[in-house]
C-alpha cells in the first residue's frame, strides 16, 4: 500500500507528489554518497517523467519502487569503487 498524504483528495496525484519528493531525496543522498551529479539528476528527471505518465496507483508505486532500487544499486556501485583492492577482493569473495 502507498502512503496517502492528506493534502489532496486525489490518491494518484498525492502518490505522484510523494514519489517526486522520494526521487529528489534519493538523488540528493546519492550525490552525497558519491554518485555523479549529472547522472543522479538525469535519473531523477527521467523517473519524474515516467511517474507523471503513470495512470494508475500500481503504476505510480512501480515507478517509485524502481527508482528506489535504481539509486540503491548506484550507491552500492559507488561505494564498491571506493574500496581498497583488499576489501574489494573480500567483498567479491563473499558475494556481496
Task: Tell what function each PLM region has.
Residues 1-95:
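Inter-domain helical "communication" segments and dimerization helices
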Amino acid at each position: 500500500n502507498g502512503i496517502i498524504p492528506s493534502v489532496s483528495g486525489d490518491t494518484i496525484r498525492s502518490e505522484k507528489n510523494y514519489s517526486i519528493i522520494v526521487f529528489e531525496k534519493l538523488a540528493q543522498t546519492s550525490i552525497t554518497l558519491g554518485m555523479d551529479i549529472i547522472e543522479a539528476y538525469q535519473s531523477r528527471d527521467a523517473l519524474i517523467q515516467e511517474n507523471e505518465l503513470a495512470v494508475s496507483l500500481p503504476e505510480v508505486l512501480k515507478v517509485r519502487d524502481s527508482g528506489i532500487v535504481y539509486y540503491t544499486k548506484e550507491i552500492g556501485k559507488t561505494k564498491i569503487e571506493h574500496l581498497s583492492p583488499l576489501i574489494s577482493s573480500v567483498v567479491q569473495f563473499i558475494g556481496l
